[in-house]
Amino acid sequence: MAPKKTTKKGGPKKRPSAEKRILTAQKRNLINQSFKSKAKTMMKKFEAALKAGDQTSISSGLQLVYSVADKAVKRGVFKSNKAARIKARATLRANAKV
């Protein structure tokens, strides 16, 4: 492990704000990517439930899609219009199967 950089007074060396913003953006990007992947997985599970035709799995899958889409908006991963589109399409597909 590399030695820690310190200032003349012995405290930790301060990072320029641009460098810090790059690091935080990279961290957020990883978190957002994992959440997007989770959302896609839930949508695929919902599609599988639609193909199976089981009513209970369709309704629970639809609830999961709604939940994940709303959480993504709350976290800032999706814009609200994208979540609305996802939920509307899922509802249309679920109603078509009923």
From Swiss-Prot:
One GO biological process term: translation
The protein's role, per its UniProt record: Binds directly to 16S ribosomal RNA.
Superkingdom per UniProt: Bacteria
Cellular component annotations (GO), alphabetically ordered: cytosol; small ribosomal subunit
Residue segments, region Disordered: 1-21
Protein's recorded name: Small ribosomal subunit protein bS20
Species of the source: Chlamydia felis (strain Fe/C-56)
GO molecular function: small ribosomal subunit rRNA binding; structural constituent of ribosome
One of the Pfam families matching this protein, by short name: Ribosomal_S20p
Family stated for the protein in its record: Belongs to the bacterial ribosomal protein bS20 family.
Keyword annotations from UniProtKB, A to Z: Ribonucleoprotein, Ribosomal protein, RNA-binding, rRNA-binding
Biased amino acid composition, Basic residues: 1-15
